[in-house]
């Protein structure tokens, strides 16, 4: 039975195979269902380059070792204090030009690494006594201890003959504040005795405790000259000046430089009196200085003739020479925006050789002021060469002459720029720096004046720091360094200064260090580099300044002034608005 079943199975298999071989159709299996095509992989979205990553990477070129080495060289005795037109000045300029050339920067104007600046040096021989008379009374002020004066004219002789002394308060005309200390009085040929600073007790007048240009000594002498005065004397106090009388002594006793006179009004004598000497002077007129000062605190003030006369004769040794701004250009990558500049500035001059100190040192090396600024800008020049991608706008590295003499080099560049002022995006200026260590803050002199606040604050935040306004607003720092020359022609300026909140230091320590330096070393031979200088904070600050410049160089829009700022009109004029 089993055998029969097996035979039947074989027969069935053979029958099916034969049928297939004879071509009989077989049922087809249904086709598999159509599969949907797999979705295409999304195209990768190109991420824009992180500007902060590029800034951080290039910023590594800014180091403490480089800063120390540069300051050591630029403030060395071999450069003799870098006085304008001296051999030390020439050597300093050559050194800075060589540094820029070695880094691969082109000459600032395409031809030379120097922009010549004509200067007129005046070395005045002032009398040992300056005598004042009122009837039978007289008083003589002693040179150096009681009075300091410089020539206001670029001639071999200067003279004042029987000129009346008139107290003119602050010597300010400010129509925007409804303030006029002169009240239309005829002051031609007079000697104007005036207060330092500007009215600082009312925030609605001027800027309260923040000094404006009206409070600068340069404004005082310019204002007196516009009145036709023969001379001007500023009454010095440390609070009103922001520095002790010794700074006046060392800054004004040597050769004084200026740009060549161009027909502008000038006083014959630009003088200073200590407040004690001024009190004695007005006393011979029966006046109390404190009462005169109080009267000057009111808009209703009118000039006070003192009935005091003075004659003053002096001789000048005239030195017509040359210094120069040193400049180097890094061309931007954008065909259009490369026609615009971001400027980094620092002054290369100091006071040269002057009156010896107690140790006999007569070289005013200017290590902090301003070999440090030059070193910081050279560091930034290095960082821009390391930046990838390169900046869209061009970068101008500018070391200016004659800052200590009244911002002369920057004034010359601002009025003889390599591109029109409307094509200068910003000036980022370095004058002094942090030699005491890391801080939790950074001081921005001019905070609130421009749109540069935003990029600076973002970069500082990334460092874990905050941006503070000028911590010594009564000193008028914005009007005392080279960004002011740019501001006057409308260019937004950024002036960074050391913070005051130092890491691992008690509250108030930073202010103490800054004030101690200004008391003992500012404009003194003792401003020399020291082994204990700590550059960690300076590195942070320089990297901030570098980063702001990168963001400005790559932005589509130019930065501007805050609406209503005193320099907004100049910017609009430069832009043809």
Where are these regions (language model features)?
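Catalytic-core environment of secreted peptidases
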Residues: 61-107, 131-133, 186, 190-212, ...
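Noncatalytic luminal/extracellular "stalk/propeptide" segments of secretory-pathway proteins
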Residues: 80-205, 306, 318, 323
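Soluble metallo-hydrolase cores and metallopeptidase-like ectodomains found primarily
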Residues: 133-138, 144-184, 263-366, 382, ...
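Metal-dependent peptidase/peptidase-like ectodomains
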Residues: 141-146, 157-158, 183, 259-289, ...
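Acidic/histidine-rich catalytic neighborhood of metal-dependent amide-processing enzymes
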Residues: 209-215, 219, 223, 240, ...
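His/Asp/Glu-rich mid-to-C-terminal helical/loop segments that flank catalytic regions of hydrolases
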Residues: 382, 386, 502-571
């Amino acid at each position: 039975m089993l055998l029969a079943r097996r035979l039947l199975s074989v027969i069935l298999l053979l029958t099916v195979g034969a049928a297939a071989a004879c071509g009989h159709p077989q049922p087809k299996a249904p086709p598999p269902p159509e599969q949907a095509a797999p979705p295409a992989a999304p195209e990768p979205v190109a991420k824009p380059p992180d500007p902060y990553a590029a800034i951080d990477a290039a910023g590594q070129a800014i180091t403490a070792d480089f800063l120390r080495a540069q300051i050591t060289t630029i403030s060395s005795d071999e450069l003799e204090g870098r006085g304008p037109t001296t051999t030390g000045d020439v050597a300093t300029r050559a050194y800075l030009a060589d540094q820029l050339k070695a880094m691969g920067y082109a000459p600032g104007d395409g031809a030379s690494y120097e922009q010549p600046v004509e200067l007129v040096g005046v070395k005045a021989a002032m009398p040992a006594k300056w005598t004042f008379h009122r009837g039978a009374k007289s008083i003589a002020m002693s040179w150096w201890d009681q009075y300091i004066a410089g020539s206001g004219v670029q001639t071999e002789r200067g003279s004042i003959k029987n000129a009346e002394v008139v107290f003119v308060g602050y010597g300010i005309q400010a129509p925007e504040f409804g303030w006029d200390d002169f009240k239309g009085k005829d002051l031609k040929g007079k000697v104007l005795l005036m207060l330092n600073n500007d009215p600082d007790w009312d925030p609605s007048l001027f800027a309260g405790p923040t000094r404006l240009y009206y409070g600068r000594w340069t404004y005082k002498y310019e204002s007196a000259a516009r009145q036709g005065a023969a001379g001007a004397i500023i009454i010095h106090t440390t609070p009103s000046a922001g520095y002790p009388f010794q700074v006046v002594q060392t800054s004004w006793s040597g050769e004084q430089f200026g740009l060549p006179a161009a027909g502008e009004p000038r006083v014959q004598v630009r003088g200073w009196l200590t407040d004690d000497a001024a009190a004695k002077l007005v006393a011979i007129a029966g006046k109390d200085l404190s009462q005169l000062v109080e009267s000057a605190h009111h808009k209703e003030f009118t000039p006070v003739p003192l009935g005091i006369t003075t004659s003053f004769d002096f001789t000048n040794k005239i030195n017509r020479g040359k210094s120069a701004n040193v400049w180097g250009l890094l061309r931007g990558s954008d065909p259009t925006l490369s026609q615009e500049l971001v400027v980094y500035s620092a002054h290369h001059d100091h006071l040269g050789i002057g009156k010896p100190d107690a140790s006999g040192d007569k070289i005013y090396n200017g290590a902090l002021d301003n070999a440090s600024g030059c070193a910081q800008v050279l560091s930034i020049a290095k960082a821009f060469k390391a930046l990838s991608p390169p900046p869209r706008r061009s970068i101008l590295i500018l070391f200016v002459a004659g800052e200590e003499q009244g911002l002369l080099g920057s004034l010359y560049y601002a009025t003889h720029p390599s591109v029109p002022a409307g094509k200068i995006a910003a000036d980022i200026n370095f004058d002094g720096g942090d030699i005491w260590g890391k801080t939790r803050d950074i001081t921005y002199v001019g905070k609130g004046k421009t749109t540069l606040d935003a990029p600076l604050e973002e970069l500082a935040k990334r460092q874990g720091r905050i941006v503070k306004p000028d911590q010594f607003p009564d000193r008028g720092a914005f009007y005392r360094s080279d960004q002011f020359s740019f501001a006057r022609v409308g260019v937004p300026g950024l002036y960074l200064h050391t913070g005051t909140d130092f890491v691992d230091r008690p509250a108030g320590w930073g202010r103490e260090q800054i004030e101690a330096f200004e008391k003992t070393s500012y404009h003194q031979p003792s401003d020399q580099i020291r082994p204990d200088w700590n550059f960690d904070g300076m590195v942070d600050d320089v990297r901030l300044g570098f980063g702001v410049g990168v963001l400005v160089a790559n932005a589509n829009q130019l930065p501007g002034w805050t609406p209503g700022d005193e320099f907004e009109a100049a910017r609009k004029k430069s832009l043809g608005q």
